[in-house]
């Protein structure tokens, strides 16, 4: 599992971005990849999965 912070999440559109703590890489997150409801600034744990446009955050949960 990786740790990061929610940079942005648009609930009405169902997507956002997470910044990984250790590398500062930014990853796309879709509502379908959430375990918990997230908001901007939340500290989260997540896994990565290859998507159509690169790596996506999945199994995202607030820590």
State where each predicted segment sits.
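Structural detector for short beta-strands of small beta-barrel domains
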Residues: 1-8
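Well-ordered beta-strand positions in beta-sheet-rich domains
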Residues: 3, 26-28, 43
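A generic beta-sheet turn/junction motif
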Residues: 10, 22, 50-52
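Short aromatic-glycine-enriched beta-strand elements
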Residues: 13-18
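Beta-strand/loop nucleic-acid-binding surfaces
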Residues: 24-36
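Short nucleic-acid-contacting surface segments enriched for D/E, G, S/T with interspersed K/R
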Residues: 34-45
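OB-fold/S1-family single-stranded nucleic acid-binding modules
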Residues: 49-63
């Amino acid at each position: 599992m990786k740790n990061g912070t929610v940079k942005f999440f648009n609930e009405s559109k169902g997507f956002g971005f997470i910044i990984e703590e250790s590398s500062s890489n930014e990853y796309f997150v879709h509502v379908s990849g959430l375990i918990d409801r997230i908001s901007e600034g939340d500290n989260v744990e997540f896994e990565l999965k290859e998507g159509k446009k690169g790596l996506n955050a999945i199994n995202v949960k607030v820590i």
